[in-house]
From Swiss-Prot:
Pfam families: LuxS. Homodimer. It comes from Aeromonas hydrophila subsp. hydrophila (strain ATCC 7966 / DSM 30187 / BCRC 13018 / CCUG 14551 / JCM 1027 / KCTC 2358 / NCIMB 9240 / NCTC 8049). Keywords: Autoinducer synthesis, Iron, Lyase, Metal-binding, Quorum sensing. HAMAP family: LuxS (MF_00091). It catalyses: S-(5-deoxy-D-ribos-5-yl)-L-homocysteine = (S)-4,5-dihydroxypentane-2,3-dione + L-homocysteine. Fe cation binds at residues 54, 58, 128. GO terms for molecular function: iron ion binding; S-ribosylhomocysteine lyase activity. InterPro entries: LuxS_sf, Metalloenz_LuxS/M16, S-ribosylhomocysteinase. Its cofactor is Fe cation. Involved in the synthesis of autoinducer 2 (AI-2) which is secreted by bacteria and is used to communicate both the cell density and the metabolic potential of the environment. The regulation of gene expression in response to changes in cell density is called quorum sensing. Catalyzes the transformation of S-ribosylhomocysteine (RHC) to homocysteine (HC) and 4,5-dihydroxy-2,3-pentadione (DPD). This is S-ribosylhomocysteine lyase. Its EC number is 4.4.1.21.
Amino acid sequence: MPLLDSFTVDHTRMAAPAVRVAKTMQTPNKDTITVFDLRFCVPNQEILSERGIHTLEHLFAGFMRDHLNGNGVEIIDISPMGCRTGFYMSLIGAPDEARVGAAWQAAMSDVLTVQEQGKIPELNEYQCGTYSMHSLEEAHAIARHVLERGIGVNRNDELALPEEKLKSL
């Protein structure tokens, strides 16, 4: 099985919250697609709560689009990581980490403005696969955590696992 890009970086050295360019590629039409690792939690030390990450998934996707789309950028998708330490964001364009971090920070502030569970987008059995598994309170705690700690940058060249280490794992 091929080694995926996300497993070539040392998770023991990742900072959080932090933005990382996980991958950049070109489409046949020469559009740039960039995948960002938006790391909310320090891997293997912290984890996003199940209900909190689910609620955040519903809120974060819209708020990030509000703050990042435009000027050559269009978000394709924002999805939670299976390890529950962050989200992957795929987009058309190549914004720098500072622009993504500023949008992320603004989106977390927006999350805190949602004051009622009933205001969570798509919170119904028709549009959500587990619509009863939400917590606005936990999503607020995650947003506050990000805002209090600030958003840094993780760089692939600083986190790359050496080839010999990859072979031994």
